[in-house]
């Protein structure tokens, strides 16, 4: 127990909760897909969102969103994950990075190419 004088000198540190704990303070993490499937979003929206269950090198098993139209990710694919939730999918707090490791970039993508790992099209 600190004294009142110690608390005046330096206040207690607030515990900061991270939004992506599985990354363990790293910008990205590598992982292996254990299951690739589609799921439906929350109430006002309707779609089949592509997600994957990923076992990370940090030991966590998380659900990650596969962005873009079409993908080549299957079970045992090695993928790179970044933080970032999907608002209408509960429990999905990570995104798979397209165009790295086993995740190919989106085909025929002309705009926002860097977000989807697409190469510059030939003129």
UniProtKB/Swiss-Prot annotation:
Q: Where in the cell is it found?
A: Plastid, Chloroplast
Name of a matching Pfam family: Ribosom_S12_S23
Q: Which InterPro entries does the record match to this protein?
A: NA-bd_OB-fold (IPR012340), Ribosomal_uS12 (IPR006032), Ribosomal_uS12_bac (IPR005679)
- GO MF annotations, alphabetized: rRNA binding; structural constituent of ribosome
What family does this chain come from, according to its entry? Belongs to the universal ribosomal protein uS12 family.
What is this protein's function? With S4 and S5 plays an important role in translational accuracy. Located at the interface of the 30S and 50S subunits.
Record-level GO cellular component terms: chloroplast; small ribosomal subunit
Segments for region (Disordered): 103-123
**Partners and quaternary state?**
Part of the 30S ribosomal subunit.
Renumbered to this chain, the Basic residues biased-composition regions fall at: 107-123
Keywords in alphabetical order, please.
Chloroplast, Plastid, Ribonucleoprotein, Ribosomal protein, RNA-binding, rRNA-binding
List the protein's name. Small ribosomal subunit protein uS12c
Lineage of origin: Eukaryota, Cryptophyceae, Pyrenomonadales, Geminigeraceae, Guillardia
In terms of SUPFAM superfamilies, this protein maps to: Nucleic acid-binding proteins
List, alphabetically, the HAMAP family matched.
Answer: Ribosomal_uS12_B (MF_00403_B)
The record's Gene Ontology biological-process terms are: translation
């Amino acid at each position: 127990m600190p004294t009142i004088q110690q608390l005046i000198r330096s206040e207690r540190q607030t515990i900061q909760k991270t939004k992506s704990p599985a990354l363990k303070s790293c910008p990205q993490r590598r992982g292996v897909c254990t299951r690739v499937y589609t799921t439906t979003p929350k109430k006002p929206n309707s779609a089949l969102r592509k997600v994957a269950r990923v076992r990370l090198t940090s030991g966590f098993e998380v659900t990650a969103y596969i962005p873009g139209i079409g993908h080549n990710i299957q079970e045992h694919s090695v993928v790179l994950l970044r933080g970032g939730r999907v608002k209408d999918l509960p429990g999905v707090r990570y995104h798979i990075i397209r165009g790295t490791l086993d995740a190919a970039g989106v085909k025929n993508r002309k705009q926002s190419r860097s977000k989807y790992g697409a190469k510059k099209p030939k003129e």
